[in-house]
Amino acid sequence: MSETFIYPQANLIAGVDEVGRGPLVGAVVTAAVILDPNRPIVGLADSKKLSEKRRLSLYDEITEKALSWSLGRAEPEEIDQLNILHATMLAMQRAVSGLHIVPDYVLIDGNRCPKLQMPSLAVVKGDSRVAEISAASILAKVTRDREMTELDLLFPEYGFAQHKGYPTAFHLEKLAALGATVHHRRSFGPVKRVLGLV
């Protein structure tokens, strides 16, 4: 079990997380959430450890009960232009700036913080230690998974609904056989190779 997180002294704390750094296709999606202490949400946890059904149920509860929540993203073209780390930081900045209530402290999952206008702290394994980050991870994952399901309708042969764009054996096989879609990240090794850019 990860060690207990000691919260900073602040009134309005936002949690931020991202989903989709590893996939070969689609945007990296981020979320920022300020929870309402008067409307607790039971069962918040790292989105990867929850069933899809539980994530969907918590998604609805978070969007209904949170004081403020916002999504951010960086598109494949931005990822290719900036690199995945900088694109993720940009998407996190977008999520925070989209909050309709300005937080006075921001907790970010991972070991790096984007440049923000308020104090922030990176929390390793934050998605399982900080409720606000857990909530953000759920919003980001449900949103990105839905986008992959929609992409699957446009390109059913790639199996995006199953692997969510991650480089599974099936995805790599289809990429080699069919080539890249306009939604693939051209700077990622397997896509580069298929496009002959290596």
From Swiss-Prot:
Q: Which residues form the RNase H type-2 domain?
A: 11-198
Catalysed reactions, as listed in the record: Endonucleolytic cleavage to 5'-phosphomonoester
Keyword set for this entry?
Answer: Cytoplasm, Endonuclease, Hydrolase, Manganese, Metal-binding, Nuclease
Q: Which domain of life is it from?
A: Bacteria
Q: Gene Ontology terms, cellular component aspect?
A: cytoplasm; ribonuclease H2 complex
Pfam families associated with the record: RNase_HII
Q: Which GO terms describe its molecular function?
A: manganese ion binding; RNA binding; RNA-DNA hybrid ribonuclease activity
Q: Which family does it belong to?
A: Belongs to the RNase HII family.
Q: Which named protein is this?
A: Ribonuclease HII
Record the organism.
Yersinia pestis
Which gene holds the coding sequence for this protein?
A: rnhB
